[in-house]
């Protein structure tokens, strides 16, 4: 008989805690709805549209870029003479330089945001950088380096670039 009373006591405590938690969650959600509706009213009392504002687009060239880019610089892509590095490096773009690229011609012209140009010592380190950065789009010359199968999990889109001119055109278009 005393065992049954102990179980009833535990059940009463569990029920009280559950009711308290449910009441707290209801109160919190109800108070957030009130604050949101008060926030969405203009001074004249009319309600505003509940629209999610899009992040401002990144300006690059003449058009806008909404994505973050990771560009792997290989031997075919290392001659980027006409690129405006000061403008490009202000955007959400990271350049990873392959270990086989010895003469990256524009490395002396870059004055700001040099942390966005990463010289990789090994291909394993290069792919570790790509996985860690998790950029929306990866630009790579597949003729110079083999892309691992799992990289698609870390980048939304993988684009094949054949030459440095095509890369410059791509950066100007986006």
From Swiss-Prot:
Residue stretches in coiled coil: none
Covalent S-S links between cysteines: none
Magnesium keyword on record: no
UniProt cross-references to InterPro entries, sorted A to Z: Peroxin-22, Peroxin-22_C_sf
GO annotations of cellular component type: peroxisomal membrane
Job of this protein: Involved in peroxisome biogenesis.
A GO biological process held by the record: protein import into peroxisome matrix, receptor recycling
Topology with respect to the bilayer: Single-pass membrane protein
Main location: membrane
Protein name stated in the entry: Peroxisome assembly protein 22
Keywords: Membrane, Peroxisome, Peroxisome biogenesis, Transmembrane, Transmembrane helix
Family note: Belongs to the peroxin-22 family.
Organism lineage string: Eukaryota, Fungi, Dikarya, Ascomycota, Saccharomycotina
Annotated compartments: Peroxisome membrane
TM helices/strands, residue ranges: 9-27
């Amino acid at each position: 008989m005393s065992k049954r009373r102990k179980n009833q006591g535990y059940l009463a405590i569990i029920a009280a805690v559950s009711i308290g938690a449910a009441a707290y969650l209801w109160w919190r959600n109800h108070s957030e709805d009130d604050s949101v509706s008060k926030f969405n009213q203009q001074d004249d009392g009319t309600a505003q549209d509940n629209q999610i504002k899009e992040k401002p687009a990144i300006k690059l060239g003449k058009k806008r870029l909404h994505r973050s880019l990771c560009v792997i610089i290989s031997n075919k892509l290392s001659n980027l003479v006409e690129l405006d590095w000061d403008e490009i490096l202000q955007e959400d773009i990271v350049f990873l330089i392959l270990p086989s690229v010895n003469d990256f011609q524009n490395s002396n012209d870059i004055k700001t945001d040099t942390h966005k140009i990463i010289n990789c010592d090994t291909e394993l380190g290069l792919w570790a950088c790509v996985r860690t950065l998790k950029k929306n789009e990866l630009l790579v010359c597949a003729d110079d380096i083999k892309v691992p199968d799992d990289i698609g999990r870390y980048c939304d889109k993988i684009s094949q670039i054949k030459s440095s001119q095509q890369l410059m055109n791509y950066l100007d278009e986006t």
